[in-house]
């Protein structure tokens, strides 16, 4: 969703009860409350000090008072109420609530099942693992009272009627269905799930027909083959390490996966960054230190940031730990158009320090034209909280560059660079035929 300065300000103003009338086409109002004015001035101060581009005063005040439609801030800038910001902080730590599913935009197709969530654990009793590419086609209080949810709107409506602690029955199908007749012909499974708080895990590893992850509930690195299908695809001298996001306990989980890789004595590792939209910069640096083959021994630069003041800051890993687990190994990367930000920065560090070449990167081609790319996000955001109110804003604060100075903002990593296109119907199919194709190509 495109967020302009006007839209961000509308959140500030509505939450703070700042003006009587705000939106476009309405005259200016002088009905300011003291607390609201303080919030607005604080917000402007953050933009002036930290936003990576200059925002003229007249553009800011026109957006605030007259409701102009200009796109003054970029799409990544966002305002949070105190409650929203607290929730965001918790989610960045991996602490979630609900059933544990995310969907592709405007669809009832699953984009992700959070590892460690109620739906993840429900896979144990399902006829097949509940994961990316399935469709949520029924929701109800019992298996006999399922309401068909063949569209996003119907699915969202039904899901929203269940709160924390409530149990719901969910029906999943392996293909999209638009009618009861199509449903009867589709492969489906129904599970019972209770909405609850959980801590998400962000790393899934597979080799030798087994899948592993660190489950926060059990506080242990364990075999989760009965919950996922990834184990069924990975055999031979290969291993797959899927990194979902750079959040929560991902850095420690990544090390657990590398230790398992060492124990399994495999020679080839596929780092799966498909649909990884990025995350925390510190976690990125902690993970990158294991993936930068020819980097300096100490404090290797993972990326650097340029701020509008002209200041440049290097963000570095503590050490080059590549040889701890990957010495003499072959590493490949899988990515797609949803691979963004920290994921692209990690790819950049791996390329610049000789861990992989562009030819070792596989990109999802959904158009069948031989061209594919990652998202192309070469800017970073920083959140700033107002200590007086608890509200916060997330603003784009800097441009980011690979160690060699390359910026992929607006471009991404592409097949034009030498990366390899792999055909797929979409960015999330069940079963994962794209992964099977990649594994076939890299099998020694």
Residue ranges and their predicted role:
Residues 133-140, 241-242, 260-278, 334:
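Short acidic catalytic loops
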Residues 92-152, 220-224, 244-251:
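PDZ/PDZ-like domain segments forming the peptide/carboxylate-binding groove
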Residues 144-266, 289, 314-323, 412-430:
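C-terminal, low-ordered peptide segments at domain boundaries
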Residues 49-109, 167-169, 173-179, 184-224:
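Extended, small/polar residue-biased N-terminal targeting/export presequences
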Residues 201, 208-230, 278-334, 338-341, ...:
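Gly/Ser/Thr-rich loop/hinge elements
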Residues 43, 64, 68, 101, ...:
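Terminal peptide-recognition signature
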């Amino acid at each position: 969703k495109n967020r302009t300065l006007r839209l961000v300000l509308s959140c500030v103003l509505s939450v703070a009860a700042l003006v009587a009338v705000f939106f476009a086409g309405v005259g200016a109002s002088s009905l300011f409350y003291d607390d609201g004015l303080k919030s607005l001035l604080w917000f402007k101060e953050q933009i002036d000090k930290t936003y990576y581009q200059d925002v003229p005063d007249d553009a800011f005040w026109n957006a605030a008072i007259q409701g102009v439609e200009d796109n003054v801030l970029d799409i990544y800038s966002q305002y949070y109420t105190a409650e929203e910001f607290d929730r965001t902080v918790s989610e960045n730590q991996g602490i979630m609530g609900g059933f544990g599913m995310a969907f592709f935009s405007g669809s009832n197709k699953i984009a992700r099942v959070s590892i460690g969530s109620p739906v993840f654990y429900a896979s144990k009793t399902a006829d097949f693992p509940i994961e990316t590419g399935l469709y949520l086609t029924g929701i109800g209080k019992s298996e006999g009272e399922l309401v068909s949810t063949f569209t996003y709107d119907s699915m969202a409506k039904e899901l929203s009627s269940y709160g924390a602690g409530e149990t719901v029955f969910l029906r999943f199908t392996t293909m999209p269905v638009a009618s009861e007749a199509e449903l009867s012909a589709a492969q489906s499974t129904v599970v019972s799930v209770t909405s609850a708080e959980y801590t998400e895990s962000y790393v899934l590893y597979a080799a030798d027909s087994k899948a592993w992850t660190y489950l926060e509930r059990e506080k242990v690195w364990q075999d989760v083959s009965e919950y996922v299908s990834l184990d069924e695809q990975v055999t031979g001298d290969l291993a797959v390490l899927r990194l979902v996001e750079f959040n929560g306990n991902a850095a420690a989980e990544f090390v657990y996966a590398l230790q398992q890789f060492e124990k399994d004595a495999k020679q080839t590792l596929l780092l799966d960054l498909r649909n990884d939209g990025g995350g925390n910069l510190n976690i990125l640096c902690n993970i990158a230190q294991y993936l930068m083959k020819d980097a300096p021994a100490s404090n290797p630069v993972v990326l650097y940031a340029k701020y509008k003041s002209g200041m440049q800051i290097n963000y570095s890993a503590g050490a080059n730990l590549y040889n701890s687990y990957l010495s003499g190994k072959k590493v490949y990367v899988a990515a797609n158009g949803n691979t963004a930000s920290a994921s692209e920065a990690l790819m950049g560090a791996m390329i610049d320090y000789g861990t992989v070449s562009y030819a070792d990167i596989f990109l999802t081609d959904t158009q069948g034209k031989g061209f594919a790319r990652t998202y192309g996000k070469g800017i970073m955001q920083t959140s700033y909280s107002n200590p007086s109110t608890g509200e916060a804003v997330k603003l784009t604060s800097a441009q980011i560059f690979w160690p060699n100075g390359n910026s992929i903002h607006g471009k991404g990593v592409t097949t034009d660079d030498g990366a390899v296109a792999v055909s797929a119907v979409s960015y999330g199919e069940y079963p994962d035929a794209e992964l099977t194709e990649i594994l076939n190509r890299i099998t020694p």
